[in-house]
From Swiss-Prot:
This is Acetyl-coenzyme A carboxylase carboxyl transferase subunit beta, chloroplastic. Zn(2+) binds at C225, C228, C244, C247. The gene is accD. GO terms for biological process: fatty acid biosynthetic process; malonyl-CoA biosynthetic process. PANTHER family: ACETYL-COENZYME A CARBOXYLASE CARBOXYL TRANSFERASE SUBUNIT BETA, CHLOROPLASTIC. Belongs to the AccD/PCCB family. Keywords: ATP-binding, Chloroplast, Fatty acid biosynthesis, Fatty acid metabolism, Lipid biosynthesis, Lipid metabolism, Metal-binding, Nucleotide-binding, Plastid, Transferase, Zinc, Zinc-finger. It is an enzyme of class 2 (transferase). Component of the acetyl coenzyme A carboxylase (ACC) complex. Biotin carboxylase (BC) catalyzes the carboxylation of biotin on its carrier protein (BCCP) and then the CO(2) group is transferred by the transcarboxylase to acetyl-CoA to form malonyl-CoA. It catalyses: N(6)-carboxybiotinyl-L-lysyl-[protein] + acetyl-CoA = N(6)-biotinyl-L-lysyl-[protein] + malonyl-CoA.
Length: 490
């Protein structure tokens, strides 16, 4: 039977110290000093990183079972806790005799000659114990549900607590190690250590070689949110449509995932998959030739270019759809991207199909010079014939980011323009504007919510509703599912 201890982190806003028992170290002491209100998280005491020894009582765990853990709330109520994973048992005991014996041990320590020699008021160990026994606000019982919810994170030893005003998710040592592969090696010992300073107090986090192996082993399982810097389990993220489960932020999606989201299974028929760029102006940079860069992105993404085009069905309604992929050279629009989108529009016009283009681009591709710029006019010309002459229906979907030549051409030509929540939409980026005009661009002035208020587009639709909204729009414009259309003709 394997039992795990839970490291209690019980806080209040004006709290000056948070404390707990650190089982794998065999010592008692404050976990970290802070005056803020972090979230309660769970930690695997047997294998996670630990702070330095902070208490001098080496035999304290003689009084505590190897499989139990002690916490105390502000009211003086103490609890002995253990969690049995195999049998799915979570127990909280209030054993007064056990607690009395433990407190008696500390009492003897406090009354020892060491404390009586004038160190009692200045002894950090004594203050740590007093803070631990009496200075926590919330009962452990109020947070058991939070512990269970965060059990998954505890299995790979990620400390996800947020220290407001100090470290954020992005600044967290362990978060950086998971997300960026920050090296933890040190030549001093078998493990490694890093000392930080939070609110005037030193904190040393120790990493063993095993911890480094765990960090590297599980790094590929997580995706970090761009907004809150929280970690999302990659296996579940796709089923959640790449929406952060912690803050609801819409993360970037690949073109293949978007096609899977919008198009009915088994109905996708791609077009012009074999079309590739030939470096028309022989663009060469000091870093990497253009052809080599194209090849590397093709290997990385599995795509031939920054857009996928094809025919499929959306809730049974035949549609022509083009989906740009920001992972391929920032979704930049070169001659191949422009040609594929133009051919898609012409095919939709010939087949009388509604058209969807999902935009995710940094603009025209500079490696192709004026050839990339002329794609704006070519696509706009094809859309003119599709919309005005054929009287067909085009929906433009703007995702983050949509900038440059795409914004200045087909991105803003939709009969209905839809944006995703929090999407970054602009012609020139913030940095370009500030460097050109020498003016500061207000924060959020290029976000979808702000631009919607200015009338730049028609709808802001979250991903989980997008397919149904598109289906209703098509029906409103007399595009029906194939089975309904045939029955109406009869």
């Amino acid at each position: 039977m394997e039992r795990w201890g839970f490291n209690s982190m019980l806080f209040k806003k004006e709290f000056e110290r948070r404390c707990g028992l650190n089982k794998s170290m065999g010592s008692l002491g404050p976990i970290e000093n802070t005056s803020e209100d972090p979230n309660l998280k769970v930690k695997n005491i047997h294998s996670c990183s630990n702070v330095d020894y902070l208490f001098g009582v080496k035999d304290i765990w003689n009084f505590i079972s190897d499989d139990t853990f002690l916490v105390s709330d502000r009211n003086g109520d103490s609890y002995s806790i253990y969690f049995d994973i195999e049998n799915q048992i979570f127990e909280v005991d209030n054993d007064h005799s056990f607690l009395s014996e433990l407190e008696s041990s500390f009492s003897s320590y406090r009354n020892s000659s060491y404390l009586n020699n004038g160190f009692r008021g200045e002894d950090p160990y004594y203050n740590s114990y007093m803070s631990y026994m009496y200075d926590t606000q919330y009962s452990w019982n109020n947070h058991i549900n939070s512990c269970i919810d965060n059990y998954l994170q505890s299995q790979i030893c990620i400390d996800t607590s947020i220290i407001s005003g100090g470290e954020s998710y992005g600044d967290s040592y362990i978060y950086r190690a998971i997300c960026s592969g920050e090296s933890l090696n040190s030549s001093e010992n078998e493990g490694s250590s890093r000392r930080t300073r939070t609110k005037g107090s030193d904190l040393t986090i120790r990493e063993s070689s095993n911890d480094l192996e765990v960090t590297q082993k599980y790094k590929h399982l997580w995706v970090q949110c761009e907004n809150c810097y929280g970690l999302n389990y990659k296996k579940f993220l796709k089923s959640k449509m790449n929406i952060c489960e912690q803050c609801g932020y819409h993360l970037k999606m690949s073109s293949s995932d978007r096609i899977e989201l919008l198009i009915d299974p088994g109905t996708w028929d791609p077009m012009d998959e074999d079309m590739v760029s030939l470096d028309p102006i022989e663009f060469h940079s000091e870093e990497e030739p253009y052809k080599d860069r194209i090849d590397s992105y093709q290997r990385k993404t599995g795509l031939t270019e920054a857009v996928q085009t094809g025919i499929g069905q959306l809730n049974g309604i035949p549609v022509a759809i083009g989906v740009m992929d920001f992972q391929f050279m920032g979704g930049s629009m070169g001659s191949v991207v422009g040609e594929k989108i133009t051919r898609l529009i012409e095919h939709a016009a010939n087949q009388n199909l509604p058209l969807i283009i999902v935009c995710a681009s940094g603009g025209a591709r500079m490696q192709e010079g004026s050839l990339s710029l002329m794609q704006m006019a070519k696509i706009s010309s094809a859309l003119y014939d599709y919309q005005l002459n054929k009287k067909l229906f085009y929906v433009s979907i703007l995702t983050s980011p949509t900038t440059g030549g795409v914004t200045a051409s087909f991105g803003m030509l939709g009969d209905i323009i839809i944006a995703e929540p929090n999407a970054y939409i602009a012609f020139a980026g913030k940095r370009v504007i500030e460097q050109t005009l020498n003016k500061t661009v207000p924060e959020g002035s290029q976000a979808a919510e702000y631009l919607f208020q200015k009338g730049l587009f028609d709808l802001i639709v979250p991903r989980n509703l997008l397919k149904s909204v598109l289906s209703e729009l098509f029906k409103l414009h007399a595009f029906f599912p194939l089975n309904q259309k045939s029955s109406k003709i009869k």
